[in-house]
Amino acid sequence: MPDFSMSNLAVAFSITLAAGLFTVLGSGLVMFSKTPNPRVLSFGLAFAGGAMVYVSLTEIFSKSSEAFAEIYDKDHAFAAATMAFLAGMGGIALIDRLVPNPHETLDAQDPSFQESKRRHIARVGMMAAFAITAHNFPEGLATFFATLENPAVGMPLALAIAIHNIPEGISIAAPVYFATRSRKKTVWACLLSGLAEPLGAALGYLVLQPFLSPAVFGSVFGVIAGVMVFLALDELLPAAKRYSDGHETVYGLTTGMAVIAVSLVLFHF
């Protein structure tokens, strides 16, 4: 397996950090902006979902199979990659079951939300931050390892996760800001949650680095592919559909796939 230089590690970590910091952008939309156009939001979420699905199934899963092929024959390598992919989906589904993502439960326009006591709203914000932070750890690990092995794969994935992090920031910022009216506390809540991604990357690398091998890389990339596909299908696409009854979701989905497909072709040249 490749021996990564400090510059490789720095680039991968920086891209992971940048993707995580997009959570803070969500706080800015809550504090300073008007309500975003639902159709634009729908398109953007679907775009991110399409990008994540495409890059996961065409590039990241292939990297898993290629890594396993260094120790198994082609058929067994594909089977091992498939098992890792399914394990990734199962693992993130379990996390989602134990710590549900609060996207669907937070709506600043809901009357019951507006009328709740500030202490209760603050507690909702803390729960949202905790839940999203738990989901951010595997996302950070995915971005870091994908970029570390091949920036042509990692950068499109980081872009998709960055877009995905904006509504997550809104989910945290809305209850915190309405409860405290403090921009500082709101930004800090989003920042701490976003930093879970580079933290997940750093911890994951420190734990796995002594054991890096074709089997480990194959397992990591297979799990990453499964996690990303699950997140796209479970969070991004349903959220995109909720914001629009038109064709914005399918347009965003196909555009995201097309843009990532073209970018990957260009990277290969």
Curated annotation (Swiss-Prot):
UniProt-annotated binding residues for Zn(2+): E139, H164, E168
Keywords: Cell inner membrane, Cell membrane, Ion transport, Iron, Membrane, Metal-binding, Transmembrane, Transmembrane helix, Transport, Zinc, Zinc transport
Catalytically driven reaction(s): Zn(2+)(in) = Zn(2+)(out)
Protein name: Zinc transporter ZupT
Keyword Lipoprotein: no
Pfam families the record matches: Zip
Species this chain originates from: Neisseria meningitidis serogroup B (strain ATCC BAA-335 / MC58)
This protein's encoding gene: zupT
Similarity annotation: Belongs to the ZIP transporter (TC 2.A.5) family. ZupT subfamily.
Gene Ontology MF terms in the entry: metal ion binding; zinc ion transmembrane transporter activity
Binding, Fe(2+): N136, E139, N165, E168, E197
UniProt cross-references to HAMAP family, sorted A to Z: ZupT (MF_00548)
TM region positions: 12-32, 41-61, 75-95, 126-146, 152-172, 187-207, 211-231, 249-269
Membrane topology reported for the UniProt record: Multi-pass membrane protein
Function recorded in the entry: Mediates zinc uptake. May also transport other divalent cations.
One biological process term in Gene Ontology: zinc ion transmembrane transport
Cellular compartments per GO CC: membrane; plasma membrane
Subcellular location(s) per record: Cell inner membrane
